[in-house]
């Protein structure tokens, strides 16, 4: 079992090797727009999980996930041999490719936040147009005794019975 620091160093090295091989050495059109995001290595250094994301050719184009997955699976052996040559470890880890869905989660959160901001703006508009119900001052002024016939002035602010 390797220590965690060694596993992290190996993962970083694998990430660099795979990313540069995809960008410069492997000439598969399905790998256009593939970006290596992260690599996780098991504690025994025998398996490496490579997380990738795919971008479209332009900002308006949708990414082609199926072509990228197929191209990565076709290049898996070549990439593993390049990792073995570049790392110098006794056992070259097997590579597993998993699409990173963080960008999808971020886009979904941005959409939810935009909807919440729009709802807040609607509530603010309703609040600006709202008027209080009833009269302008529905509460009685404590100094006013108008309309109180037969009530002793000393009993107006008392909380106990009117017959003191």
Swiss-Prot record:
Function according to Swiss-Prot or TrEMBL: One of several proteins that assist in the late maturation steps of the functional core of the 30S ribosomal subunit. Associates with free 30S ribosomal subunits (but not with 30S subunits that are part of 70S ribosomes or polysomes). Required for efficient processing of 16S rRNA. May interact with the 5'-terminal helix region of 16S rRNA.
Localization per record: Cytoplasm
Similarity field: Belongs to the RbfA family.
Subunit structure: Monomer. Binds 30S ribosomal subunits, but not 50S ribosomal subunits or 70S ribosomes.
Coiled coil region boundaries: none
GO molecular function, one term: ribosomal small subunit binding
Main location: cytoplasm
One Gene Ontology cellular component: cytosol
PROSITE patterns (alphabetical): RBFA
PANTHER family for this protein: RIBOSOME-BINDING FACTOR A, CHLOROPLASTIC-RELATED (PTHR33515:SF1)
Protein name from the UniProt record: Ribosome-binding factor A
Alphabetized UniProt keyword annotations: Cytoplasm, Ribosome biogenesis
GO biological process annotation, one example: maturation of SSU-rRNA
Source species: Mycobacterium leprae (strain TN)
């Amino acid at each position: 079992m390797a220590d965690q620091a060694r596993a992290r160093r190996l993962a970083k090295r694998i990430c660099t090797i795979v990313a540069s091989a995809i960008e410069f050495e492997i000439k598969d059109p399905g790998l256009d727009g593939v970006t290596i995001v992260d690599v996780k290595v098991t504690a025994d250094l025998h398996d490496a999980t490579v997380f990738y994301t795919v971008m479209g050719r332009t900002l308006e184009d949708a990414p082609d996930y199926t072509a990228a997955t197929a191209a990565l699976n076709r290049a898996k052996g070549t990439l593993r041999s390049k990792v073995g040559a570049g790392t110098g470890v006794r056992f070259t880890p097997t590579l597993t490719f998993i699409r990173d869905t963080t960008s999808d989660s971020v886009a979904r959160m941005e959409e939810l936040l935009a909807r919440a901001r729009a709802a807040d703006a609607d509530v603010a508009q309703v609040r600006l147009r709202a008027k209080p119900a009833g009269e302008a001052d529905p509460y009685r002024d404590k100094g006013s005794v108008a309309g109180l016939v037969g009530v002793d002035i000393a009993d107006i602010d008392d909380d106990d019975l009117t017959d003191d």
